[in-house]
């Protein structure tokens, strides 16, 4: 829909697909990024294999941050997947939010301005009515 994380540090992507086999969603994630997912339909999971796991059910949203290494994630077979991802390079967000660092939620502040870059998986939660409205308008 918009942008390119590698070139300008930001991208908004609409995903609408059906799959017959489980899909390795994690291979689409960008290194050193913070990504927000608004999941309208389909089942997905981010994390696991010794770390925190968050399940994306229809109507859920959440975020995950990548360091240099991969982050396991999958999309379930036989589902109709519809979701939006807002993808940002950590560097882009650091530059844009440096003057507002104190206003950020503690976990987001740690992801962007902490001393150690690491993979982070936040718990998915139900989308608000406003978030649903924005996604439905795309």
Segments from the language model and where they lie:
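N-terminal low-complexity or simple alpha-helical regulatory segments
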Residues: 1-43
């Amino acid at each position: 829909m918009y942008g390119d994380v590698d070139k300008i540090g930001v991208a908004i992507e609409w995903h609408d697909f059906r799959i017959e086999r489980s899909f390795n969603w994690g291979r689409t994630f960008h290194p050193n990024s913070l990504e927000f997912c608004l999941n309208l339909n389909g089942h997905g999971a981010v994390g696991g294999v010794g770390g925190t796991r968050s399940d994306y059910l229809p109507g859920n949203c959440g975020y995950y941050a990548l360091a240099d290494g991969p982050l396991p994630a999958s999309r379930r077979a036989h589902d109709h997947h519809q979701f939006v991802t807002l993808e940002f390079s950590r560097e882009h967000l650091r530059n844009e939010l440096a003057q507002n660092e104190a206003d950020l939620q503690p976990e987001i502040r740690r992801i962007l301005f902490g001393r150690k870059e690491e993979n982070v998986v936040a718990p998915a939660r139900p989308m608000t009515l406003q978030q649903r409205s924005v996604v439905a308008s795309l």
